[in-house]
Amino acid sequence: MRIGMEELRRALALLNGQGYEFMVFIKEKDHLISESIPKNLFSESFISSSIEKNPPLTFDPLVNRKRITVYEENIQPAIMLPLDQPLLIQNYLYTAFKLLRQVPCKAIAKLWIKIIEPRKKTRFPYIKGNAGRPEWWPKDVEHKEPDHLQKADRLKLMCTIIMNVLPQSPFSLEILDELTGVTAAMTIFKKETVKKVIMKNVFEIAKCLCNKDFKQKTISLDDLNDLAQKQKKSYHSRRFDVNKMVKVEKDLLQQSSGSDSSPSMILPSKESDTEYFPREYPKDPVSEDYSNSISRLENLVEFDPLFLTKLDELTSSDDCKDFI
């Protein structure tokens, strides 16, 4: 019953964030009337922010005022992710990385590998293929530069780093702090707020998995359904801005026709997101005897209805419309 109620609350929060109006009354299966509780028809109620901030007194016969939830405006829907279920964690991470799009994921994966395996180029060169991969590298992922991997393999590699490699390292929290800092400094996260929020949730998961003293069984994270919708709106908004810029440029060209001057275009300097030289640790942060069979990622699911609606309905092909 409680699981069903959590799903209902999350769905209503998502609808509220999208501007829907609703008033929902719930009567529990074993709703009992006691002397301490007024004789109400329903045990709980949920009201959207757009209907009314303060429920009127006419609600009193229907539900106890203390059991009325009024959703705030612009509330960020959240989900509770169980930390003792690796498949659900893997699914959330996989979907989060997919929402980032693949150009950013290529840069992030290369940066992470430089930090967790500082001397990889000399000890585990890509030129040796699968025979030269480190112990922590997923067995079912080819040993290639992240740029050259298939999308599914690249996302699987990133999930492995968060779920397996970092928690197994003797310097997990120190390395995680370094990963968090250098990732946040990448240009992509300065331009797009939604992607920054997505990575914040990814690192929250990593922090819980790396912290041996963390006793909670669940963690509250932003609902990827809502973030996907916001990213879709942001993408269409920026595409509209680009179209306006093109129109302005055409107008300027028409105005300047017949003159010697022409509008100049200032091209931004290309910033490298992968040129980073990690600090050395007293010993290799990734243990040599790391067993890849532990928590091996298998049977990846692209999305889970608890977390994300089908991405094909929200965006077009990842391969054709990657953007930074």
Curated annotation (Swiss-Prot):
A Pfam family annotated for this UniProt entry: YDR124W_N
An annotated GO cellular component: mitochondrion
The protein's name in its UniProt record: Uncharacterized protein YDR124W
Ranges of compositional bias, category Basic and acidic residues: 270-286
Biased composition (Low complexity): 253-269
Other observations noted: Present with 3510 molecules/cell in log phase SD medium.
Tree of life domain: Eukaryota
PANTHER family attached to this UniProt entry: CHROMOSOME 10, WHOLE GENOME SHOTGUN SEQUENCE (PTHR36102), YDR124W-LIKE HELICAL BUNDLE DOMAIN-CONTAINING PROTEIN (PTHR36102:SF1)
